[in-house]
């Protein structure tokens, strides 16, 4: 089994790591908040489909779908995204539920500046 992990890593793990001069929004989203872990679909081996970055995925519980937060689909402003991440309220006054409620609980402790950096990253996903 352990040798299979090495094969998986060689196929799917990025070799580059976040460096000292990395863009702070990239660091916040990809390293700390790890938004893509839920919002990016996976292949049959459990690796993220990077060509569908942040385009939504099946819910691991088997019920429903994790929504796309790709800018083609999520039409919120940066300020609305930052507000959602700090309060859990959508622009339509819906509330974050499930695991996202836990994410909001943790992200709400970040500064407004950091939340806007996360929102900026999300608005600029290609």
Language model region names:
Residues 1-12, 41-73, 95-99, 108:
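Primarily the internal scaffold of c-type cytochrome electron-transfer domains
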Residues 19, 98-103:
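Short glycine/proline-rich turn/loop motifs
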Residues 25, 32-42, 118:
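The canonical Cys-X-X-Cys-His
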Residues 33, 53-90, 103-116:
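Electron-transfer interface patches adjacent to heme c in soluble/periplasmic c-type cytochromes
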Residues 29, 39, 86-89, 126:
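Protein kinase-like catalytic domain
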